[in-house]
Regions:
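N-terminal small/polar loop signature for handling phosphorylated ligands or for N-terminal nucleophile
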Residues: 1-24
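Short glycine-rich anion-binding loops that position phosphate/pyrophosphate groups of nucleotides
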Residues: 4-7, 130, 160-161, 190
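Short, acidic/small-residue loops that bind anionic groups at enzyme active sites
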Residues: 16-40, 48-54, 183-184
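Buried hydrophobic positions in well-ordered alpha/beta secondary-structure cores of metabolic enzymes
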Residues: 33, 107, 155, 202-205
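Glycine-rich, charge-decorated loop segments at or immediately adjacent to ligand/cofactor-binding or catalytic sites
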Residues: 35-45, 193-200
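Conserved anion/nucleotide-ligand pocket segment
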Residues: 46-108, 112
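Internal helical hairpin/lid segments
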Residues: 114-169
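ATP/nucleoside-binding phosphotransfer catalytic cores, i.e., glycine-rich phosphate-binding loops
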Residues: 159-217
Length: 217
């Protein structure tokens, strides 16, 4: 379990012996800047990691019961589905792929590396204190990568804390989803807010916006 996020995880990526990790699999979990490690571990080893609360940032303070229960339930007994609460659906539909993503600005920083999954994927994204024009720019940069756009089958948005313009945010994803014509929705409880789910990155899943559910298969 990571202690905290912040910055600097990307500096570690070329210094890690991924064969050691692959041959000695362990639960690896965190969020925010830790996204860089999670996605590269999945890419280089095929091992599932977990978007989850962290030791100092969450368990070291006043963590809530919801986050604690989700953490231990998921890691001890597994998770079968996620209900997307209070979701805004920008484009209806059903899609499948590996659940993949995390902190948007951290993912953008990986561009130039071989980090994208080989499989079709459902992209999850969250961030904090990023103006909407930068969110627009980061998504656009990713979509300009043919491998990203071709394998992208759905988008699920988590918490984007500290937004400067909620209407622009909504308008951007409404327009984007109409252009891509893939299921796109909000409602995944992960990011930098107090309550957060624990769930696997790299697990096969089905997104059904009509049922507001992600089901792991």
């Amino acid at each position: 379990i990571a202690c905290r996020g912040g910055y600097g995880a990307i500096r570690l990526l070329d210094k890690i012996d991924y064969d050691i990790i692959k041959n000695n699999p362990k639960i690896f979990c965190g969020y925010s800047d830790i996204t860089a490690l999670e996605l590269m571990i999945y890419k280089r080893t095929g091992l599932v990691t977990y978007n989850a609360p962290m030791a100092y940032s969450d368990f070291g303070s006043d963590i809530d019961d919801f986050s604690t229960k989700s953490f231990f339930d998921t890691l001890q007994t597994g998770i079968k589905e996620i209900t997307l609460n209070s979701s805004t659906v920008f484009y209806d539909g059903i899609c499948s792929g590996v659940l993949w993503g995390g902190n948007l600005s951290t993912i953008q920083s990986l561009c130039g590396l071989d980090f994208l999954p080989e499989e079709n994927f459902i992209f999850i994204a969250e961030d904090i204190n990023e103006p909407v024009y930068k969110i627009d720019k980061m998504f656009t940069q990713l979509l300009n990568m043919p491998a990203f756009k071709n394998r992208l089958k759905g988008i699920v948005l988590g918490d984007f804390s500290g937004l400067d313009n909620e209407k622009y945010f909504q308008d951007f994803f409404k327009e984007l989803s109409q252009e891509l014509k893939i299921p796109t929705t909000t409602g995944l409880k992960f990011g930098h807010e107090k309550q957060k789910l624990t769930f696997p990155i790299g697990a096969n899943a089905v997104l059904d916006t009509n049922l507001s559910k992600i089901t792991f298969i």
